[in-house]
From Swiss-Prot:
PANTHER family: 2',3'-CYCLIC-NUCLEOTIDE 3'-PHOSPHODIESTERASE. InterPro entries: Cyclic-nucl_3Pdiesterase, Cyclic_Pdiesterase. The active site is at residues 39, 137. This is 2',3'-cyclic-nucleotide 3'-phosphodiesterase. It is an enzyme of class 3 (hydrolase). Involved in the metabolism of ADP-ribose 1',2'-cyclic phosphate which is produced as a consequence of tRNA splicing. Its EC number is 3.1.4.37. GO terms for cellular component: Golgi apparatus. It is found in: Golgi apparatus. It comes from Eremothecium gossypii (strain ATCC 10895 / CBS 109.51 / FGSC 9923 / NRRL Y-1056) (Yeast). It holds the Pfam family CPDase.
Length: 216
């Protein structure tokens, strides 16, 4: 993962407080769970070797999202919305909120991927990555627990549904997932304001650190 770009809800906002409280409440269910800041990863593998590189990533991300603001305001829904809760089989997506498809969010990811991951910049490769590999989500639990038993799934479904004030409706899980529940109603996340952060994600999660941040 090395260096990643996160998009975070505004600190002390209702979305931040709700999700952060949920992350805390789920810690007790997984013996190896660790704490982390609520975020959606826009992309990882950034070419970022200096403070100037980090500043350039932030400037591009902010510019890309600000350019969408009139259209976001006109439609009245945020760029980050959640339509499902999933239990995955991998450490970083063990329990997560899946983002609804949003062309503005995907557009920001494509811009950053093209400019700061592809070397040299390659619009076609960035577009292919967005359509084939980009699965934006907000993690609630990181854990190496491979199989989540039915009793724990029931507790997760109840606790997450209560925290979000939504029904979790079972759906057939996609490959790589153990369980999938549709959120009814879908949950609004955030748009602008928000905070982009360039984060060095090396070693244990407790050792990750923010290299630079910019608020929108």
């Amino acid at each position: 993962m090395a260096v990643a770009l996160w998009y975070c809800p505004p600190a002390n906002s209702p979305c931040y407080d709700t999700v952060n409280s949920l992350i805390l409440s789920l810690q007790t269910l997984f013996p190896d769970a660790v704490l982390f800041e609520p975020h959606v990863t826009i992309t990882s593998q950034l070419r970022c070797d200096s403070a100037d590189d980090a500043a350039a990533v932030l400037a591009a991300a902010c510019a890309a999202l600000r350019a969408c603001r009139p259209q976001l305001d006109a439609r009245g829904s945020p760029v980050v919305r959640f339509d499902a809760v999933a239990v995955g089989r991998r450490y970083f997506d063990k329990v997560h909120l899946a983002c609804a498809h949003d062309r503005f969010l995907y557009g920001v990811a494509q811009v950053i991927r093209e400019l700061f991951v592809q070397d040299p910049p390659d619009p076609a490769a960035a577009a292919d990555w967005v359509h084939s590999s980009f699965r934006p989500h907000l993690s609630l639990v990181y854990s190496d627990l491979y199989h989540v038993d039915q009793a724990l799934l029931r507790v997760l479904r109840q606790r997450i549904g209560d925290a979000l004030g939504a029904a979790l409706l079972p759906h057939p899980p996609a490959p790589g997932l153990q369980a999938l529940w549709a959120l009814q109603p879908p949950l609004d996340g955030w748009s602008i304001p928000g905070s982009f952060k360039v984060v060095r994600c090396e070693g244990p999660v407790r050792d990750w650190h923010v290299l630079a941040a910019a608020d929108l």
